[in-house]
Amino acid sequence: DVGVVLFNMLTYGNARILGGIADAANSNGYAITMQSFGRNRERTLHAAIERMKQLPVDGVIAVMEEHVTDFSEFRPPKELPVVIISEDPANYCPTIDADQYGCSAAVVDYLLSKGHKTVYHIAGPSSSRAAESRAQGWHDTLDQLGLRIPPTYMGDWEADSGYQAGLALAHDP
């Protein structure tokens, strides 16, 4: 089995990542064993991997969409291969991810090239690594072009927060 560690399996991005891992595992004759570390558990990579070591897995993919206290010093155990999916590269562990910063900057450039005067940003939760990088890409792109940085609307990946931000934006001249 392939072990998968998620801190929140309900977000759209994480559900898509989990689906992709499951499809790839199935195509290669593996199943997945998933461990979701909710708000009530110690939120460290070490704790997550220690839990996975107790399960019948051949390796672990840790989806690090949120900040954990031991990310920079985490070292995977010798007996269990670990790959981290994270915006930031881990110091001692193989890491993969999409370029959240670059994608955000590209979207801003594209919208401005279509004649928009500015681009507003509806951010994900402050605990999200991807949301942090996307916000920075948006901010830096506007700043480099000398454009005013409009206020950020904070969200939480849920539809209602996006709806509320949309209502607020609709009233912004």
Language-model regions: role of each:
Residues 1-109, 113, 171:
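Alpha-helical recognition/docking segments in bacterial nutrient-uptake
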Residues 6-16, 34-43, 96-106, 122-143, ...:
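Hinge/beta->alpha junction and helix N-cap segments in small-molecule ligand-binding domains
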Residues 27-28, 142-148, 172-173:
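Short helix-capping segments at alpha-helix termini
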Residues 30, 49-51, 112, 116-119, ...:
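Bulky hydrophobic/aromatic packing residues
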Residues 58, 116-118, 148:
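Short acidic/polar active-site loop segments enriched in Thr and Asp
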